[in-house]
Amino acid sequence: MFVTSAFAEETAPAVTGGDTHSGTGVPAEAHGTFPPFDPATFPSQLLWLAITFGLFYLFLKKVAMPRIGGIIDVRNDRISQDLDQASKLKGEADAAVAAYEQELAEAKKNASSIGQQAADAAKAEAETARKKIEAALDEKLGEAEARISSIKANAMKEVGSIAEDTASAIVEALVGGKASKAEIAAAVKSVAR
């Protein structure tokens, strides 16, 4: 509020009837002890303290503590249910891990047996193919040896005639005359033996 100079000049009405405190306006003779500290009021204060404490105790006992106890019981029940569920889930997880490990071991065993079977099958196929190839090579080798022996036999047959022709040419060149075929054949046969 805005104070004007005219309002500020007004003076408070004077109190008639005795001395007053300057700040409170309370008469000086009313100056006594603070009522809660007055020994004359202790019995009533103690009575009200007991009544208030009793009511507060009854309130706590009948209202607050049952609610708090109920909340604690609910929490304990929830915790025990959670622990039971956790142990159940842990058991299920352990069972799942055991089943997984068993299936993994079986899969490894199956993979090993499948690998062994595949290796055995490949080895058998390779052995069969090797035997077929060896048989084919033996057959070709036999045919080649037969051809070589026939070529050799033919060559040996012709060697005699070639030797006779060569001997005839040598005799003609050295002696200057011709020898008979029968003489040359007899000479080649005697040397070939």
UniProtKB/Swiss-Prot annotation:
CDD domains in the record: ATP-synt_Fo_b (cd06503)
Ranges where the record places region Disordered: 13-32
GO molecular function, one term: proton-transporting ATPase activity, rotational mechanism
Gene Ontology CC terms, in alphabetical order: plasma membrane; proton-transporting ATP synthase complex
Keyword annotations of the record: ATP synthesis, Cell inner membrane, Cell membrane, CF(0), Hydrogen ion transport, Ion transport, Membrane, Transmembrane, Transmembrane helix, Transport
Keyword RNA-binding appears in the UniProt entry: no
Residue spans crossing the bilayer: 40-60
Subcellular location(s) of the protein: Cell inner membrane
UniProt keyword Transmembrane helix, yes or no: yes
Topology of the protein relative to the lipid bilayer: Single-pass membrane protein
Subunit structure: F-type ATPases have 2 components, F(1) - the catalytic core - and F(0) - the membrane proton channel. F(1) has five subunits: alpha(3), beta(3), gamma(1), delta(1), epsilon(1). F(0) has three main subunits: a(1), b(2) and c(10-14). The alpha and beta chains form an alternating ring which encloses part of the gamma chain. F(1) is attached to F(0) by a central stalk formed by the gamma and epsilon chains, while a peripheral stalk is formed by the delta and b chains.
Family label: Belongs to the ATPase B chain family.
Cited function: F(1)F(0) ATP synthase produces ATP from ADP in the presence of a proton or sodium gradient. F-type ATPases consist of two structural domains, F(1) containing the extramembraneous catalytic core and F(0) containing the membrane proton channel, linked together by a central stalk and a peripheral stalk. During catalysis, ATP synthesis in the catalytic domain of F(1) is coupled via a rotary mechanism of the central stalk subunits to proton translocation. Component of the F(0) channel, it forms part of the peripheral stalk, linking F(1) to F(0).
Protein name from the UniProt record: ATP synthase subunit b 1
Organism for this UniProt entry: Mesorhizobium japonicum (strain LMG 29417 / CECT 9101 / MAFF 303099) (Mesorhizobium loti (strain MAFF 303099))
Gene: atpF1
